From Swiss-Prot:
The keyword Methyltransferase does not apply. Tetramer of two alpha and two beta chains. Coiled coil: none annotated. GO terms for molecular function: tryptophan synthase activity. Disulfide bonds: none annotated. It comes from Prochlorococcus marinus (strain NATL2A). GO terms for cellular component: cytosol. Pathway: Amino-acid biosynthesis; L-tryptophan biosynthesis; L-tryptophan from chorismate: step 5/5. Its EC number is 4.2.1.20. This is Tryptophan synthase alpha chain.
């Protein structure tokens, strides 16, 4: 596996015998000024990497919480260019990898080369495109790699075993394991077969594995850690807390939740 910002972060975290905490945040919800403050607050409270969503009007992989966040962000005038501008202004302060989560349409509208070029200029380390099939990933992966950006691919519980191996072999930075069948959203419990999927991926690839979709609390992070995964992505639960907090408390609420989750990433014992 080649050395990138993301792979180096996972290597460092593994030496610390814990898993990576990777919160998801919707850019522009409620506005980009608040998003900038929350990004720094998450970093200060133990986030190892941050997945930053580019709002899109038809987010097929997302449940109602993140759909509403995207709608609010779009209503506030958030666009890829404005997100890039915000990240450029934070570039000297953000020291952890930023991974953009975007659907194909905003990428295509801007042009793959131009999107990746702008992302690179503002310090983006990774890219997740949930509606990009494996068969169409090679071109974007090559462009992203030329800009030192990892294109991260997703594996779902319903993905056939042979295809899962191909995705894990193609994904850069880490493999994103979707823990549930369906869309993003908070869950009271995680599906039992995810642990075996983690093992299958580890048997077929040296790439780190991060589990997302439905990871909502400390118990879920402990479960992800016990499965032997390398990272936990927390999205809807954080987005919901930010949405429910008053405008004065959104940044503080995000930070306190992140700090609580970070504590659960420790004591990761490798076999």
């Amino acid at each position: 596996m080649k050395s990138t910002n993301i792979s180096r972060s996972f290597s460092k975290i593994k030496k610390e015998k814990r898993i990576a905490l990777m919160p998801f945040l919707m850019a522009g919800d409620p506005d980009l000024e608040t998003t900038a403050k929350i990004l720094l607050e998450l970093q200060a409270n133990g986030a190892d990497m941050i997945e930053l969503g580019i709002p899109y009007s038809d987010p097929l992989a997302d449940g109602p919480i993140i759909q509403l966040a995207a709608s609010r962000a779009l209503s506030a005038g958030t666009s890829p260019d404005r997100v890039f501008k915000m990240l450029f202004e934070l570039r000297d302060q953000l020291t952890i990898p930023i991974i953009l989560f975007t659907y194909s349409n905003p990428l295509i509208n801007k042009g793959l080369e131009e999107f990746c070029l702008q992302a690179s200029k503002v310090g983006v380390s990774g890219l997740v495109v949930p509606d990009l099939p494996l068969e169409e990933a090679e071109k974007l992966s090559d462009i992203a790699e030329s800009k030192e950006i990892d294109l991260v691919l997703l594996v779902a519980p319903t993905t056939p075993k042979d295809r899962m191996k191909r995705i894990a072999a193609t994904s850069n930075g880490f493999t994103y394991l979707v823990s549930v069948t369906g869309v993003t959203g908070e869950r009271s419990s995680l599906e039992d077969n995810v642990g075996s999927l983690v093992q299958q991926l580890k048997d077929s690839s040296s790439s780190p594995i991060a589990v997302g979709f439905g990871i909502s609390d400390v118990k879920h992070i402990e479960q992800v850690r016990e499965w032997g995964a390398d990272g936990a992505i927390v999205g809807s639960a954080l987005v919901k807390r930010i949405a429910n907090a008053s405008i004065e408390m959104k940044v503080e609420e995000a930070g306190s939740f992140c700090k609580e989750l970070r504590a659960a990433t420790n004591e990761y014992f490798f076999k």
